[in-house]
Amino acid sequence: MDDLVAVGSRQYFFFLMMLLLSRGADFLSTWIATPNMVLEGNPLAKMLGWKWGSFINLVLCGVFGAWPLAAIFIGTTSVLVAARNFQAAWLMRSLGEENYRDWYVERLRQTGLPLYLFCLLGQTLLTASVGGALIYFTGDSLIPFAVGFGIVGYALAVTFYTLLALWRIRRAPAE
């Protein structure tokens, strides 16, 4: 599973294209949802901005295109993140970034923390269980293992960045 493919080979270009498409979908969905990155949950992505974030992503796609396990993991996680972004992007765009953030924060403040955390963990643990099952039952096959790993990675990312946003919101003074 740790085998690399030769840079410039057919397999390399397959994994490179897969990464470019999946990372591109993540970028597109993020741009539609939050063109000014007001709602971006990843502090590093927010700090890098669109220009540097795009450049670093292109470089990383070129590097990880030679490592199938990483390429499939990153690709799986990226398309799941893009799908999640697209789910609410229309609402974010129609309300505007600032108004959506204010609306979301108000909903959080009106919801009991235990209910919110239960729903978040319900969503992410159920998602991770699908990935975990793929990992567990995959045997020696690279593709289902990497897809399962990507699903678990997605669930962990959603949990981490959602809890990070929740922590920031709860420590900020109420307006």
Predicted regions mapped to residue ranges:
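Charge-biased, low-complexity intrinsically disordered regions
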Residues: 1-175
